[in-house]
């Protein structure tokens, strides 16, 4: 048996598709726990409609938006299974992805498994090249670290873990998935990356949403002890990636890069100024359809 946990906040446009993408690949004895936190739209009614027709789905509501850490703890506390798969409320989990994650738990030393996020973004969008480059590079790093036995940074879009490896999640204003990996590692378990467990993720389509998403993640890294990602580390591999892009798209790529650097600066400010969860966790609206 497995438990699939889905934290969600104001995802009325896509939450039903997310849940259905999971239900099609789990067994009758498995369960899906959806935690709706402080929703002010029709997210809860959308979930309730699925609960009414599929007994595998359970809904837990929070009156206020308390962050992903709070929702994850509710999922862990209410999960009937030892293996928990977590995905977000605004993604599509591709067929067989869940099975490809959980097969790794045949090894008792494995405490966490990361899926493979696949960005969805129009080719003519300003951030197209930058988005594909960054996702590809992150995947390459995860695969390399797995081969070296050093992988620990799970992807919050799609991951799985043993409940005994991660009995609770500390409050974090951002990069919750990174904190999860640190705890699993501290508890003596290994983690791996599964490149064939695909999850479709809609990328931000405008500068405002791009900055909102990237800045909150960067703030989370700055708040994480010995955070794994820095501007210096990412700029080191930028020249190599640049020459994989057609020359006529370089201006668009560099423009996106400037916006990206601004998001780093904003993330640093949000972390150092100790801004609240709601101030850090801005919703990129263009990713919600």
Sequence positions of predicted segments:
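Long helical/loop segments within the catalytic core of UDP-sugar-dependent glycosyltransferases
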Residues: 60-61, 70-71, 101-165, 215-218
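Short aromatic/hydrophobic "clamp" motif used to bind/position activated sugar donors
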Residues: 84
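A conserved acidic beta->alpha catalytic loop
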Residues: 21, 36-45, 64, 91
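Conserved donor nucleotide-binding strand/loop of the catalytic core
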Residues: 30-33, 44-78
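Acidic donor-binding/catalytic loop of UDP-sugar-dependent glycosyltransferases
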Residues: 42, 91-103
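Terminal low-complexity segments of carbohydrate-biosynthetic enzymes
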Residues: 219-289
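Catalytic donor/gating beta->alpha subdomain of glycosyltransferases that bind UDP-sugars
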Residues: 105, 112-136, 170-232
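Short, acidic, metal-binding catalytic loop of nucleotide-sugar glycosyltransferases
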Residues: 20-29
